[in-house]
């Protein structure tokens, strides 16, 4: 697959280009295109017309123009194959490309088979979410009106004095009038306000989330159901994220909430038809095991080898209590500590995320103490972070190709997964790079997780009997659909492959 091979070679590379007409941001990032048309132009200097791409290819007889179009597409494949194979070899990425190629059949099967959706339950949950959103909307508008807010009149629109929560201007004007010093109505700014006691901002965030679940998830799913088999047939993209992870669209299954009762209620809408069962397995918690491997932290490795609960161990080290005395609440707080600090989170962010994501109240002093004791307990994680930071000063040669220069190398900041997948950032003038510190921390871990999932998918697919289908990948979870009589065997097969590949 030329697109996958090229995406592996370019490995997330962006270029900075001057935006001459910009009034604020004078530089913009540009990501190289990886379509067959773009590859032919970049590597061969050949311009492929796509005029007949959407023409009727199911006709009994193809037109002469269609035949020429198809022939030109085929003509560029062999020379592109030779160039891309050499590019993979020069960058030592052949095995990563092979990993992607092996996973591809399972991705095709997921798209073709689709996800079975309980339409009645989906419609019921959608109506419930819309009702919740309407209640929140009325509350937001009533509080704004009580505080004296009155919307500005706009030409060409029907006037309402009520605040429109979808209008950034309305929200900004109202909050500033209440004395809040903000310049953005984005999620981060609103979370900051809610964290500091602004209940209206918290209600607005909940309204946005509930509306999105009702309209962008549930309602769109019902509209996207195939009239042929009543299933959701999304598009999966193996390498659309720079770390090598999956994404999807039409619908975006990857946006299904991962945590909490709300996420569970939505995921339960995927139900097997009569006579079938869904078999699921995930790589939950794999980030900590990956970090143990990347950092070679002795305490982490020994804990995993001994079968210890790392969240309880962290809670024990922070609190000074024996592991057996750790409470459920303390373990929950340690989850926030573990999952945030392995990616370089600071105490201020830890305090906020503990509350937002895990429902744990933590003072700033407690967050600072947890931060100190975490890195005291896992010193090699701190050493790994320091090593990653130095990468910004140590760009390496990465090979690229175009038809004008042929093969050439460019200095680039590079991170690698355990498997050897690269993510690169171009090195700019004065040492500036597009890589942020947190990206240098989390790209190797997230990319390794993606490598594991794809290796598992490829092996599982080749091991499945014909009557069992791989139907989905949501976050780090794989979903199979099997006849009831085979479900237990498939669960054992899936678990065995995941353990073997993960080891």
Model-based region annotation:
Residues 72-79, 438-461:
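Conserved pre-motif C helix in the palm subdomain of viral-like polymerases
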Residues 88-98, 452-478:
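Active-site palm subdomain of RNA-directed nucleic acid polymerases
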Residues 479-483:
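Short hydrophobic/aromatic beta-strand micro-patches
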Residues 1-89, 97-100, 308, 312-319:
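Active-site-proximal helix-loop-helix substrate-binding element of RNase H-like nuclease domains
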């Amino acid at each position: 697959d030329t697109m996958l091979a090229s995406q592996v070679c370019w490995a997330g590379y962006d270029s900075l280009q001057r935006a001459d007409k910009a009034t604020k941001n004078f530089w913009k990032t540009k990501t190289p295109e990886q379509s067959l048309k773009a590859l032919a132009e970049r590597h061969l200097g050949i311009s492929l017309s796509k005029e007949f791409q959407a023409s009727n290819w199911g006709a009994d007889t193809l037109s002469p123009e269609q035949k020429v179009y198809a022939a030109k597409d085929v003509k560029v494949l062999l020379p592109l194959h030779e160039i891309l194979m050499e590019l993979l070899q020069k960058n030592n990425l052949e095995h990563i490309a092979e990993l992607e190629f092996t996973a591809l059949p399972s991705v095709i099967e997921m798209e073709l088979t689709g996800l079975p959706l309980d339409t009645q339950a989906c419609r019921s949950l959608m109506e419930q979410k819309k009702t919740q959103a309407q209640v929140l909307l009325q509350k937001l508008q009533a509080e704004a009106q009580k505080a004296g807010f009155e919307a500005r009149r706009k030409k060409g629109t029907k006037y309402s004095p009520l605040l429109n929560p979808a209008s950034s201007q309305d929200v900004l004007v109202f909050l500033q009038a209440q004395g809040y010093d903000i310049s953005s109505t984005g999620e981060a700014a609103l979370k900051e306000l809610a964290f500091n006691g602004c209940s209206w901002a918290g209600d607005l965030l909940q309204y946005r989330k509930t509306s999105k679940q009702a309209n962008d998830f549930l309602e769109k799913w019902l509209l996207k159901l195939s009239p042929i088999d009543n299933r959701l047939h999304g598009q999966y993209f193996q390498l659309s994220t720079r770390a090598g992870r999956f994404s999807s669209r039409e619908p975006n299954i990857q946006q299904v909430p991962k945590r909490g009762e709300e996420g569970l209620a939505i995921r339960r809408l995927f139900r097997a038809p009569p006579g079938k069962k869904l078999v699921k397995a995930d790589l939950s918690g794999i980030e900590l095991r990956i970090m143990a491997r990347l950092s070679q932290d002795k305490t982490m490795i020994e804990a995993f080898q001994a079968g210890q609960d790392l969240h309880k161990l962290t809670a024990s080290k922070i609190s000074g209590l024996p592991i057996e005395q750790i409470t459920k609440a303390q373990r929950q707080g340690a989850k926030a500590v573990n999952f945030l600090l392995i990616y370089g989170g600071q105490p201020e962010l830890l305090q906020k995320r503990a509350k937002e994501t895990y429902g744990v109240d933590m003072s700033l002093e407690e967050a600072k103490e947890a931060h100190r004791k975490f890195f005291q307990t896992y010193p090699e994680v701190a050493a790994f972070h320091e090593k990653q930071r130095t990468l910004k000063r140590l760009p390496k040669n990465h090979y690229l190709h175009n038809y004008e220069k042929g093969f050439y190398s460019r200095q680039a900041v590079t991170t690698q997964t355990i498997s050897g997948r690269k993510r690169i950032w171009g090195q700019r003038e004065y040492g500036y790079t597009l890589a942020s510190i947190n990206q240098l921390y989390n790209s190797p871990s997230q990319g390794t997780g993606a490598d594991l999932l794809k290796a598992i998918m490829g092996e599982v697919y080749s091991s499945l009997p014909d009557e069992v289908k791989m139907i989905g990948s949501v976050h780090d979870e794989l979903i199979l659909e099997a006849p009831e009589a085979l479900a237990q065997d498939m669960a054992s097969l899936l678990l065995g492959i995941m353990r073997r590949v993960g080891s």
